[in-house]
């Protein structure tokens, strides 16, 4: 939205969010395209999901499935813009009180209506410490009234600033104005969950026989570590525009296996990590099937800021400086990613970042400064720094970890032991803080700097670097005290500078989204930098 439009609406006291003239996106099949008789899609999802409960998930694999099973107030269109989901329209007063008008024909897969009461229950459940959601802090990012006290256990979840004005009107009250609040509502964690099923079946409510969904698809079959199969939900409000009848998600963690099964015809769409050793070959052999698109993600190494010796900023800074990003990006990976100097990608909406001075240095100068800092911290050739580098099971992450360990050894003289864990164990280890340095990646939940920066707040449930900085926390809090976009961007830049000063993480590269897509998969655009793919927008062309 332009500043002119925004200012005029602020003057009126009400901002009506960007709403498409038509209903939310669905499969748009061009005239003349012949559809296949069999409308089924097979996607690789990168790993076994952590859960199918929207309040128990935090990774990309889980979000991919959740988008098809559950629909929140808003969804993304094919270019990544927030669009109507269960809410067909909404407005706000001074960016602080937001009112969402729900579709009267929105239903659960059991035929019961989706109501504002479902959202009240679901958001209270997400906030409740007893749920132990890894995304409880997401409601803090939206500054919903009373969320801080609820997470701290000082108030009950029922005090959350949400209410049902009637069955189809949902009101959210924030503790302070948040102009971009509506952007947060695309994320799966704020989708509704079915109260009756949750209360009846407890932790088993997501099993195929028990689950009730409100998205375009429902769960047909789930064989752990083998496949998740979804089928069309005939109760979905926009089911008439859905084309694909069944989608299968495979938990293949090996990028090479992913490509091999794609080329054998078993998979229609690979995961968004391409094998390093096959990428250039694939570009030559099947160029029309190799998709390389923008992706709002940062690949980095997460340092345990609370664990000695990594609680010494000199050690963290030495690791940051001595990593040769050009080798990683241009020689090891070579897929078009960009060397990173920050946590927030500089092309994020509202980001006006300043390159740090060290990023302008030669690698030789960075290495010299890194060795000096490490020596000051007490580590020398006779007493080298030795630590474990943790990564989740993946061909790509393993190759990068090997390369990074070698670079740090050469440039800094440190000894790195590599350790890998399966996805769910890996996430638990990081949350518990029982690691030295870990491979990490963050992909934006919405296109705004706080989608990255909020995760580094001292009290964030996403803060697995265990970084604590009152100065950083204050800068983020101050962003909500300014109405001017330019001033807000300046504060975001200062927050990034604080992260850099503290060397909270080791940024490696800003991602591109590289995957293989069969030519008969219609509706895939690759234009959404958040990579929010909804299978209801896709279709299979006759081939």
UniProtKB/Swiss-Prot annotation:
Q: Which cysteines are joined by disulfide bonds?
A: 297-443
| Compartment annotation | Periplasm
Describe the disruption phenotype. Mutant cannot take up cell wall peptides.
| UniProt-recorded Gene Ontology molecular function terms | peptide transmembrane transporter activity
Q: Which region is the signal sequence?
A: 1-26
Matching entries from InterPro entries are given as: Peptide/Ni-bd, SBP_5, SBP_5_CS, SBP_5_dom
Instruction: Tell me yes or no: is Disulfide bond among this UniProt entry's keywords.
Output: yes
- Statement: the UniProt record of this protein carries the keyword Protein transport: yes
Give the GO biological process terms: peptide transport; protein transport
- Which Gene Ontology cellular component annotation is one that this UniProt entry carries? ATP-binding cassette (ABC) transporter complex
This protein's superkingdom?
Bacteria
Q: Which keywords label this protein? A: Disulfide bond, Peptide transport, Periplasm, Protein transport, Signal, Transport
Tell me, what's a Pfam family for it? SBP_bac_5
UniProt similarity note: Belongs to the bacterial solute-binding protein 5 family.
* Function noted in UniProt: Part of the ABC transporter complex OppABCDF involved in the uptake of oligopeptides, including the cell wall murein tripeptide L-alanyl-gamma-D-glutamyl-meso-diaminopimelate. Plays an important nutritional role and is involved in the recycling of cell wall peptides. Binds peptides containing from two to five amino acid residues regardless of their sequence. Also binds cell wall peptides, such as L-alanyl-gamma-D-glutamyl-meso-diaminopimelate.
Question: What is its quaternary makeup?
Answer: The complex is composed of two ATP-binding proteins (OppD and OppF), two transmembrane proteins (OppB and OppC) and a solute-binding protein (OppA).
Q: What else is known?
A: Isothermal titration calorimetric measurements of the binding of lysine-containing peptides of different lengths to OppA show that the dipeptide Lys-Lys is bound with 60-fold lower affinity than related tri- and tetrapeptides (Lys-Lys-Lys and Lys-Lys-Lys-Ala, respectively).
Show the domain comment.
Accommodates the ligand side chains in large hydrated pockets which impose little specificity on binding. Tight binding is achieved by utilising the hydrogen-bonding potential of the main chain of the ligand.
| Protein name as annotated | Periplasmic oligopeptide-binding protein OppA
Q: Which species does this protein come from?
A: Salmonella typhimurium (strain LT2 / SGSC1412 / ATCC 700720)
């Amino acid at each position: 939205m332009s500043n002119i439009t925004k200012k005029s609406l602020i003057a009126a006291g009400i901002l009506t969010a960007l709403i498409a003239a038509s209903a939310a996106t669905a499969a748009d099949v061009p005239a003349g395209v012949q559809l296949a008789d069999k409308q089924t899609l097979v996607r690789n999802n990168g790993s076994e999901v952590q859960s199918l409960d929207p309040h128990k998930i935090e990774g990309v694999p889980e979000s991919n499935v959740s988008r098809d099973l559950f629909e929140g107030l808003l969804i993304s269109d094919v270019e990544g813009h927030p669009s109507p989901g269960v809410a067909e329209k909404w407005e706000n007063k001074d960016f602080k009180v937001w009112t969402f008008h729900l579709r009267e024909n929105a239903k659960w897969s059991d035929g019961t209506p989706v109501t504002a009461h479902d959202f009240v229950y679901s958001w209270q459940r997400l906030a409740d410490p007893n749920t132990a959601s890894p995304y409880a802090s997401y409601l803090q990012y939206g500054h919903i009234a009373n969320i801080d006290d609820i997470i701290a256990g000082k108030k009950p979840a029922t005090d959350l600033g949400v209410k049902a004005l009637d069955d189809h009107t949902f009101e959210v009250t924030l503790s302070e104005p948040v102009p971009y609040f509506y952007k947060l509502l695309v994320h799966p964690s704020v989708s509704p969950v079915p109260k009756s099923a949750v209360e009846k079946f407890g932790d088993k409510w997501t099993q195929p026989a028990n689950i009730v969904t409100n998205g375009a698809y429902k769960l047909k079959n789930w064989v752990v570590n083998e496949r998740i199969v979804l089928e069309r939900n005939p109760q979905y409000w926009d089911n008439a525009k859905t084309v694909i009848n069944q989608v299968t998600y495979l938990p293949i963690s090996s990028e090479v296996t992913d490509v091999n099964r794609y080329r054998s015809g078993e998979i229609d769409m690979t995961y968004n990590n391409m094998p390093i050793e096959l990428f250039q070959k694939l570009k030559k052999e099947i160029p029309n099937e190799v998709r390389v698109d923008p992706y709002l993600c940062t690949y980095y190494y997460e340092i345990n800021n609370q664990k000695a010796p990594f609680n010494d900023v000199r050690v963290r800074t030495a690791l940051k400086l001595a990593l040769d990003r050009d080798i990683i990006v241009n020689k090891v990976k070579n897929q078009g990613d960009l060397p990173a100097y920050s946590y927030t990608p500089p092309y994020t909406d509202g980001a006006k970042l300043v390159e740090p001075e060290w990023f302008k240095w030669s690698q030789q100068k960075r290495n010299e400064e890194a060795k000096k800092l490490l020596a000051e911290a007490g580590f020398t050739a006779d007493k080298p720094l030795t630590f474990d580098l943790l990564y989740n099971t993946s061909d790509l992450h393993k190759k990068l970890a090997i390369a990074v360990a070698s670079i740090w050894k050469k440039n800094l003289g440190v000894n790195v032991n590599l350790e890998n864990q399966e996805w769910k164990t890996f996430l638990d280890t990081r949350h518990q803080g029982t690691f030295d340095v870990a491979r990490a990646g963050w992909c934006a939940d919405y296109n705004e700097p706080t989608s990255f920066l909020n995760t580094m707040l001292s009290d964030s449930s996403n803060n697995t670097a265990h970084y604590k900085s009152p100065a950083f926390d204050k800068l983020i809090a101050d962003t909500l005290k300014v109405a001017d976009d330019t001033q807000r961007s300046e504060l975001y830049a200062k927050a990034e500078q604080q992260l850099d000063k503290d060397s909270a993480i080791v940024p490696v590269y800003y991602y591109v989204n590289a995957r293989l897509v069969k030519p008969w998969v219609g509706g895939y655009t690759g234009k959404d930098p958040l990579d929010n793919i909804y299978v209801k927008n896709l279709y299979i062309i006759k081939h």
